């Protein structure tokens, strides 16, 4: 076969009949191999060869009949065989990778050494600057993906795989990306009763995917209803008492039909779940209270009522990790809502009383890493706690840069704690592809007989048990006929021929006969458990087998091979390289 290819590719008529530009490497003359210097013996041999060869088969000298000049190629391939097999190998690799038969290519060092942090916040705060240059787990960078809830979407599977889609506008350009975050920092409210402010489905999806976050996704979902949070504060009030935890009185109405009991006026009615002073109305008398009840009927939600406190100032006690700050806000415009109009904000000393408030509230819902307690200080000299905020609380005061740095350090600390115990899963590798491999690999190892290839084409029928362990030969041509009885006939022929090479060895070959016959008997039973030992029907160099050996298929693919076949693959590749080198060097 090799001689036929050498003669065929060396034929000048075969090259001349090719279209212009096709296999240009064969049509282009080789300037690096000039004809030998003319001598008396060489001239005589050349003349004899020219006289003996027919006209169409005569190879003209390059100087007298130059080869047709093909179109200039930017980067010609070194040989036809290498270009053919490289293109075929690339096509097979791409097809196998797209079908999931081989492992996905290993990510680059930059992608392996980075953890993705998803920050859900408004764009006025650039969290990428806060995490720039920070590392976790020793040498992993932090890649920040920042977006609002309205710009996110996700899909999560029960096996732990998930993907987050992000559509953001950057400088007027719509950017669409899909990624897999390793950690989530939520700085935005997940639910509001205004239009298009309900993002609880995204929180559910993150919990479904098992994403770690600050605060916990369970607590974020629980904070989507303020009466639910207030119920937790009622439990703290009952535990600590009114002196240590002065909680304001509040009445809960699940719907408008229950708003019949008249409270002590004036009261503040809060409708549904809202933020930044929305849905809060000051009611002076029972007539206004009835009007508010009719408004609650249209909203089809719950409402709460609490006594109006004539306050001197508001108090906010915040906790970020182990850092505590207390602020006092005084209204200048005289509005009963201190967040409306003009107000003066200043930081006050952190007392043990304030610290007890925020520490007690930080233990609800399994623990809050970031939280704040809001209270009012009345003109009667008493404090009244009325609300708790979670990680979506806005940063206030002159120390916002410091607070952002505290949040950054807290996120890094949590990522070091949680991600170190979480193995990184490849998003494109199936989780169950490596399990069925264990059973098929134990049989060849137990019998100490690695899968062998058939003897070469035209060679002697050497039994598989007698092949040298370090040398594997290409397959031979199989006789045409039905394929079903081939396994039994091959096993019987191998067992009958196993004793033939042992005859010239004298009486010392008795043990070798027994071992070879036992090995051949074991191999006769092996084809049902090891289908890789079936002979290949293709005779020409067994190209499919050589291509299979050229690819590094792992245990997750359908090519089941043992560790002993690595030497066989290397030997086959070396033999193919030598064959093609001798073929195209002529």
Curated annotation (Swiss-Prot):
Comp. bias (Pro residues): 61-77
Molecular function in Gene Ontology: ATP binding; identical protein binding
Region of interest (H), residue spans: 459-537
Keyword Phosphoprotein in annotation: yes
GO cellular component, one term: glutamatergic synapse
Tissue-wise expression: Expressed exclusively in neuronal cells. Isoform IIb is enriched in sympathetic cervical ganglion.
Chief place of localization: other
Region (E): 538-586
Region called G, residue ranges: 422-458
Protein origin, superkingdom: Eukaryota
SUPFAM superfamilies noted in UniProt: Glutathione synthetase ATP-binding domain-like, PreATP-grasp domain
Subcellular location: Synapse
Keywords from the UniProt entry: Phosphoprotein, Synapse
Entry-linked Gene3D superfamilies: 3.40.50.20, ATP-grasp fold, A domain, ATP-grasp fold, B domain
Post-translational modification: Phosphorylation at Ser-10 dissociates synapsins from synaptic vesicles. Phosphorylation at Ser-426 by MAPK1/ERK2 and/or MAPK3/ERK1 may play a role in noradrenaline secretion by sympathetic neurons.
GO biological process: one example: synaptic vesicle cycle
Signal peptide extent: none
Record-linked InterPro entries: ATP_grasp_subdomain_1 (IPR013815), PreATP-grasp_dom_sf (IPR016185), Synapsin (IPR001359), Synapsin_ATP-bd_dom (IPR020898), Synapsin_CS (IPR019735), Synapsin_P_site (IPR019736), Synapsin_pre-ATP-grasp_dom (IPR020897)
Annotated region (A), positions in chain: 1-29
Complex and partners: Can form oligomers with SYN1. Interacts with CAPON.
Physiological role: Neuronal phosphoprotein that coats synaptic vesicles, binds to the cytoskeleton, and is believed to function in the regulation of neurotransmitter release. May play a role in noradrenaline secretion by sympathetic neurons.
PANTHER family: SYNAPSIN, SYNAPSIN-2
Domain notes: The A region binds phospholipids with a preference for negatively charged species.
Listed name of the protein: Synapsin-2
Species the sequence originates in: Mus musculus
């Amino acid at each position: 076969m090799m001689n036929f290819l050498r003669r065929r590719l060396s034929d000048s008529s075969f090259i001349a009949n090719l279209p212009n530009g096709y296999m240009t490497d064969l049509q282009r003359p080789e300037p690096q191999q000039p004809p030998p210097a003319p001598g008396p013996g060489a001239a005589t041999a050349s003349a004899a060869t020219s006289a003996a060869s027919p006209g169409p088969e005569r190879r003209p000298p390059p100087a007298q009949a130059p080869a047709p000049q093909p179109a200039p190629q930017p980067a010609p391939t070194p040989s036809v065989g290498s270009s053919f097999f490289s293109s075929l190998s690339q096509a097979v690799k791409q097809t196998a990778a797209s079908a999931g038969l081989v492992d996905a290519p290993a990510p680059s060092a930059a992608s392996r050494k980075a953890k993705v942090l998803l920050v859900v916040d408004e764009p006025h705060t650039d969290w990428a600057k806060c995490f720039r240059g920070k590392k976790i787990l020793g040498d992993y960078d932090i890649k920040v993906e920042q977006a609002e809830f309205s710009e996110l979407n996700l899909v999560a599977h029960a096996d732990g795989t998930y993907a987050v889609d992000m559509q953001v506008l950057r400088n007027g350009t719509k950017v669409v990306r899909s990624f897999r975050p390793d950690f989530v920092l939520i700085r935005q409210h997940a639910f509001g009763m205004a239009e298009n402010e309900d993002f609880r489905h995204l929180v559910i999806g993150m919990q479904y995917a098992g994403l770690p976050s600050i605060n916990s996704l369970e607590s974020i979902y629980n904070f989507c209803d303020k009466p639910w949070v207030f119920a937790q504060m009622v439990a703290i009030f009952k535990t600590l008492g009114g002196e240590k935890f002065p909680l304001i009185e509040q009445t809960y109405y699940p719907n408008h039909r229950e708003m019949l009991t008249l409270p002590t006026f004036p009261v503040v009615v809060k409708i549904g779940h809202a933020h930044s002073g929305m849905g809060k109305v000051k009611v002076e008398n029972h007539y206004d209270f009835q009007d508010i009840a009719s408004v609650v009927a249209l909203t089809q939600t719950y409402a709460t009522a609490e006594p109006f406190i004539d306050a001197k100032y508001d108090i906010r006690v915040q906790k970020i990790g182990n850092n505590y700050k207390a602020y006092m806000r005084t209204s200048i415009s005289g509005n009963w809502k201190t967040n409306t109009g003009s107000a003066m904000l200043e930081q006050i000393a952190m007392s043990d009383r304030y610290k007890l408030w925020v520490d007690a509230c930080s233990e609800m819902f399994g623990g809050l890493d970031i939280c704040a307690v809001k209270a009012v200080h009345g003109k009667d000299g008493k404090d009244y706690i009325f609300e708790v905020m979670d990680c979506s609380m806005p940063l206030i005061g002159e120390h916002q840069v410091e607070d952002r740095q505290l949040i950054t350090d807290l996120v890094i600390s949590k990522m070091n704690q949680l991600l170190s115990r979480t193995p990184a899963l490849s998003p494109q590798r199936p989780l169950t592809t490596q399990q069925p491999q264990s059973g098929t690999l134990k049989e060849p190892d137990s019998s100490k007989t690695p899968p062998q290839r058939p003897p070469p084409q035209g060679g002697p029928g050497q039994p598989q048990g007698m092949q040298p362990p370090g040398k594997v030969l290409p397959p031979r041509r199989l006789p045409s006929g039905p394929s079903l009885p081939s396994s039994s006939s091959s096993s019987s022929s191998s067992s009958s021929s196993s004793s033939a090479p042992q005859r010239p060895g004298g009486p010392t070959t008795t043990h070798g006969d027994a071992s070879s016959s036992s090995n051949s008997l074991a191999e006769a039973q092996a084809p049902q458990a090891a289908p890789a030992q079936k002979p290949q029907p293709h005779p020409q160099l067994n190209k499919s087998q050589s291509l299979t050996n050229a690819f590094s298929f792992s245990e997750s693919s359908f090519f089941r091979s043992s560790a002993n076949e690595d030497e066989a693959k290397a030997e086959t590749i070396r033999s193919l390289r030598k064959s093609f080198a001798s073929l195209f060097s002529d």
